[in-house]
């Protein structure tokens, strides 16, 4: 178990809509550098920060979902390598444990690889460990800044796409899981597009799937939406079909944890049935993700390892049993949406539509790789 401690902050769910919640930050107090995480498992009841002083603490936080969401996992992984280097731990061992902390989100391994490559290059160039640690930290900060810029670009491209697909505004958008500032170095992925529409007066309502079993929609997306003052409504996952049938969904916007070379998308479990509903009801189904989420080394969705979460996440609620003792639970964290069901993939480089392998390859550089390929 790693070394971490908590700091409880004042809870203000309304906040400042122009200041996205920072999911993580690097600090250098007198006792040594730390990575500070906003503990997402405690939201919305309380705002608590985890202060990680070593890599085991960060790995524990990643596996426990205190920090989650593909883009920010990449940033956390890069900072984790820097943390190991700055504090004098075995950097290669740290990188291995970080890259394998969660198997599906490709950004985690990508961030680890970038910081590790910078560290090794500095050592190979004759630098001492201190200079190599500084190089790893600089790379982590660069990735953090790049993701903030990517978030803003995705918001612009996504807003333009909505205007083309749904002229006239007044959007009613359905989203799944959580894709705001909590998963990003900026204002998010899909939620950044929603927020841009809200700021321009184009959003009528955001429909928020609760996102069973860990309720990331109810706990996190509703929390972020409330801070902005946008109109939003929470619904159970099983109510989505009736919402489509009533004509109350104009578009579905989701994020992604990994996008394969053929355009199929791994995202929070429950995304695939929304894509099927959207196709049946002739509603645009849009994926918003940075190019770091595109894994050209994974041919198709069948090659993506799907994380299986503990059964108690389904059989218990807030520690209380909701199923008979001994009940087995099927609890995949993600599912795969085929490219054929996706209207468009929005990246910082532009929009892929229709979603084909060639179109995706042309817009997205081949730089993200799975954790098994990451550290070489």
PLM feature spans:
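Long amphipathic alpha-helical segments
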Residues: 5-6, 20-127
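Short beta-strand segments
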Residues: 38, 76-80, 111, 174-178, ...
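Short, hydrophobic/aliphatic alpha-helical segments
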Residues: 50-66, 89, 167, 171-175, ...
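Generic structural signal for well-ordered, non-membrane alpha-helical segments
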Residues: 51, 55-58, 70, 74, ...
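Conserved phosphate/anionic-ligand binding catalytic regions in large, soluble enzymes, centered on
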Residues: 64-77, 107-108, 178-186, 330-346
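Ligand-binding beta-strand-loop-alpha-helix segment within the catalytic cores
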Residues: 110-173, 202-204, 208-252
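Histidine-anchored nucleotide/phosphate-binding helix
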Residues: 188-199, 275
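Conserved phosphate- and dinucleotide-binding cores of soluble alpha/beta proteins
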Residues: 203-204, 209-376
């Amino acid at each position: 178990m790693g070394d971490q401690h908590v700091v409880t902050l004042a809870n203000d769910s309304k906040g400042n809509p122009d200041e996205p919640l920072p999911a993580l930050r690097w600090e250098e107090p007198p006792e040594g550098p730390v990575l500070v995480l906003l503990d997402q498992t405690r939201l919305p009841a309380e705002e608590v920060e985890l202060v990680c002083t070593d890599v085991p603490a960060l790995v524990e936080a990643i596996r426990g979902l205190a920090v989650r969401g593909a883009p920010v996992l990449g940033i956390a992984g890069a900072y984790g390598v820097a943390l190991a280097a700055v504090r004098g731990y075995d950097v290669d061992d740290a990188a291995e444990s970080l890259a394998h902390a969660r198997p599906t989100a490709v950004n985690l391994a990508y961030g680890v690889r970038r910081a590790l490559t910078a560290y090794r290059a500095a050592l190979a160039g004759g630098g001492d460990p201190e200079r190599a640690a500084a190089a790893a930290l600089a790379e982590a900060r660069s990735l953090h800044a790049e993701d903030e810029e990517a978030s803003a670009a995705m918001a612009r491209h996504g807003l333009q796409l909505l205007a083309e697909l749904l002229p006239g505004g007044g959007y009613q958008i359905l989203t799944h899981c959580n894709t705001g500032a909590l998963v990003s170095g900026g204002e998010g992925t899909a939620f950044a597009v929603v927020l841009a529409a809200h700021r321009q007066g184009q959003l009528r309502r955001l429909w928020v799937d609760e996102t069973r079993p860990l309720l990331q929609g109810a706990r996190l997306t509703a929390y972020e939406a409330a801070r902005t003052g946008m109109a939003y409504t929470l619904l159970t996952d099983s109510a989505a079909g009736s919402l489509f049938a009533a004509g109350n969904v104009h578009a579905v916007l989701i994020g992604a944890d990994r996008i394969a070379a053929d355009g199929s998308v791994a995202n929070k479990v429950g995304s695939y049935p929304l894509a099927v509903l959207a196709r049946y009801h002739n509603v645009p189904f849009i994926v918003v993700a940075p190019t770091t989420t595109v894994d050209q080394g994974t041919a198709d969705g069948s090659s993506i390892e799907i994380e299986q979460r503990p059964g108690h996440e389904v059989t218990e609620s807030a520690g209380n049993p909701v199923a008979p003792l001994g009940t087995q639970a099927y609890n995949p964290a993600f599912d795969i949406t085929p490219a054929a069901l996706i209207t468009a993939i929005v990246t910082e480089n532009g929009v892929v539509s229709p979603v084909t392998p060639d179109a995706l390859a042309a817009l997205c550089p081949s730089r993200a790789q799975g954790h098994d390929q990451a550290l070489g």
